[in-house]
Amino acid sequence: MCKFIQNQYIYLGMIVLMLLLTSDICRAEFTIEDENKLGREFYEQLEQHQMILHNKVLTDYITGIGNLILDQTTRTPFKFNFFILDSSAINAFATPGGYIYINKGLLLVAENEAQLAGVIAHEIGHANARHVASIISKSQKLNMAALAAMLAGVFLGGGGEASAAITAFSLAGSSSMTLRYMREHEEEADRLGIDYLVHAGYNPSAMVDFLKIMKQYEFLSKTMPSYLQTHPGTDDRIIYMDGLIMTRYRQPGKNSIIGNLCRVQASVPLSASELSRRQRQLETSLAKDPQNTDLLYNLAMIEDQLGANSSALEHLQKALVQSPDDHEILKSIGLLHLKTGRYEQAQDYLLRAKKSDP
């Protein structure tokens, strides 16, 4: 069974686990303690199935963004934790207890830090508003199929056999009430998220820009990205947030605060098929912006992993023309020369990299 479909069955199993764990809790108030316990159980299942990427560069980056956003909130019910999941599906979600998960697929399609920050701010909004607790508390008004639909909408996404199975099961028992709850939650998470984003200093339009990118993916591929499957009402959300930006958040913000997203993306571990797909994506982007230093660097790193050393060196040299004192570019050229046995050139570039180390 391919890893993608296998992961979908794991998610499905976790949803069943959540249903079982909450069946008794549903009869009473779903407390902060209950949320912490459920969130921890979900996290441990992800760890057990090796679905979390333990990559310091990636984790530090999203945690830095998350903490910057959390500094703008007046009250948070949880101690938040941020993780990258080893999934190429373009998705993100928050589980009970303040656990925020970003799929590596989403990390790779975001065009700048502000767009990624918008996704994280939205998920923090879900957690702070305790939307999963609200779903479970309302479950007395829903049958089990409708509750499964809502939990699947929060956590699953991504297509595949498991997604199709849970969707078919869920729709059979869901109702307009289910959809209304989900749309209300999305609107509240957007309202909270864009406020967090602005006060953190980011460009508020980035949230809308990311949704438009997802709509473009849907148009080009004829399939709906996981993020749109699990975050309904996209067109309405775009209109709503555009209105907020025009009336309340007109001040410009920054697209990058913590660090250069494009350089961070180069640290995302990819399978052979993912490397080839990423190479095509970067080549398409570079055709539109051939002098972009970050795109040249990122493409070179992919080519290096694919064994295309000559192409990698060519793109690094082009990047160096644009940014002659760039530490990472100089170091990468030196290491590439070292790998191919050009020791004198390697020494030269590595010494230059050392001198340029910020």
Predicted feature descriptions by range:
Residues 11-22:
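Bacterial N-terminal signal peptides
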Residues 26-30:
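Boundary at the C-terminal end of the N-terminal hydrophobic targeting segment
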Residues 40, 52-54, 60, 176-328, ...:
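Extracytoplasmic and endomembrane cell-envelope/extracellular-matrix remodeling and assembly machinery
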Residues 84-98:
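Catalytic zinc-binding patch centered on the HExxH motif and its immediate surroundings
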Residues 102, 118-126, 130, 189:
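Active-site recognition of the HExxH zinc-binding catalytic motif
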Residues 104-118:
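Short pre-active-site segment immediately N-terminal to the catalytic Zn-binding motif
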Residues 114, 124-141:
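Catalytic Zn2+-binding segment of zinc metalloproteases
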Residues 141-159, 165-177:
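Membrane-active amphipathic alpha-helices enriched in small hydrophobic residues
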